[in-house]
Amino acid sequence: MAKIIGIDLGTTNSCVAVMENNKPKVIENAEGTRTTPSIVAYAEDNEVLVGASAKRQAVTNPENTLFAIKRLIGRKFDEEVVQKDISVTPYKIVRADNNDAWIEVRGRKIAPPEVSAQVLMKMKKTAEDYLGESVTEAVITVPAYFNDSQRQATKDAGRIAGLEVKRIINEPTAAALAFGMDKKEGDRKIAVYDLGGGTFDISIIEIAEIEGEHQFEVLATNGDTFLGGEDFDSSVISYLVEEFRKESGIDLKKDMLALQRLKDAAEKAKIELSSSQQTEVNLPYITADASGPKHLAVKITRAKLESLVEELIERTAGPCRTALKDAGLSVSDIDDVILVGGQTRMPKVQDKVKEIFGKEPRKDVNPDEAVAIGAAIQGGVLQGDVKDVLLLDVTPLSLGIETLGGVMTKLIQKNTTIPTKAQQIFSTAEDSQTAVTIHVLQGEREMASGNKSLGQFNLTDIPPAQRGMPQIEVTFDIDANGILHVSAKDKATGKENKIKIQASSGLSEDEIQKMVKDAETHAEEDKKALELVNSRNQCDAMIHSVKKSLTEYGDKLEADEKSKIEAALKDAEEALKSGDKEAIDAKTQVLTEASHKLAEKMYAQEQAQAGQQAGPGAGSASAGQSGEKPVEGEVVDAEFEEVKDKK
């Protein structure tokens, strides 16, 4: 039976794990590392690079190297957080036809789930290489505070990658599974503080033994889906840019290549300062002006870094206190605090966690791998390999509909255990009203306009009646993935309409199917693209060689021979523009055959010159000064071989 793998699809890095002999195992990728950068690069000639290879070329290809795409998934272009990202990312974030935030790469608009699918495909391949068998099913994690649209978009990404997503689970819950599976210490309440590359979550979870069953119940969750290590990096980048501007008067903000180098340097400096008190950012030739090249050299102390990101760290305190309040607990009720996400390695973050919860956070959980391990355990539960484990998760935000006066009426409160179902009766607002619009919302604000719109649909053909008379039953049903299904039914006629909330990724079923097919044919396309590149390179090399030789030896050819070669050259150049591999190969062959006569003339001339050489020393020197040496230089290997054979 094929394994269900667990994937932590992270903002900065991703990780994959699987259950093996009843134990979760993190799988190393082809590069030998246990985590993979969540970076996708679109090179020329349609080549797609994922992970470390994409990260390595980012400095030279910033506009087409996509990172932190998870921050855009399921978001609208006009959202404030998206607009903020536009000002700091080297790649182009654009408005899609349905007002979603998409990315434009090499003239093509790409949906965030399609980019995330590339990372998931890399994770899938990593697992397949290790297991030696095909993988088609996965448990994928998302931030606990992801809304319905973001969850649906993540599920779409899985489908595009060729994976059936058996379950979407929250990252802190997955980390709790990883922490608590082997703990037999009785009932305990834990706080999972998850500060990753792009998102922050806090979950209060109760781990209990109930009739021999290991139960993980989420009591409350909170967070910020636009707060993470990327923001810490941005603070360091802004500081470096400002320091350089003060010193040189040059603003690096509009220099994409410089910004990409700064991003790499800022991330390295931030990591170094977790274990040392001072580091130096050294970037030679960062830019240049009329006076020459400029170099950036800035010392950063740990204290300086902490002052730069103090506000970001403080932003995590509010959600922690809210989660405790929602769970009906005080700080003293928490037995353990677990740190998840690479950014929690920063000493100042650990100090803040200790300050909030009044106790030292535990260090026995790997912050980079815990989430993937938990996802693999959940995969084992779904497969039946892991027994006696019950996971009770919650919906992070309240769900409801817009009612008269633009008010949001909540049907399901935040932190309700899922799966769950809720029903409520509504009526019409006007006399003789024959249709109602059900506008589905998610959020905590009282007014509809302050909440996230998840979608809307109409219930029509309601028999005319006085306002308030018809009875419209609205049902909200949240599945185990936290994805919402809504229906509305006229109780008088039995007429019903329903909607499965589509992600604001805006991907219709047809678009998803198209992307699935694109992904399936991607390997074949890669092969064809590589063959085309090779053919182009061969043709280009032949054109260059023939042109050069024609310039030097063309006068020794008959007129018809020369015109034949020139015609073949022109045809080959035209074929290069077409991108048709067969045409390029054919014209390369024609050019090769047409240039045979030219090669004969070249060979004859070289033989004549070789015969005129007086001696190896003097001959070489005089030839070098005669102006004829460059001709020999072009065929230097063959020419010297010839001479040695003769002597």
Swiss-Prot record:
Induction: By stress conditions e.g. heat shock. Pfam families: HSP70. Signal peptide: none annotated. Residues 604-627 have a biased composition (Low complexity). The keyword Ligase does not apply. HAMAP family: DnaK. Belongs to the heat shock protein 70 family. This is Chaperone protein DnaK. The gene is dnaK.
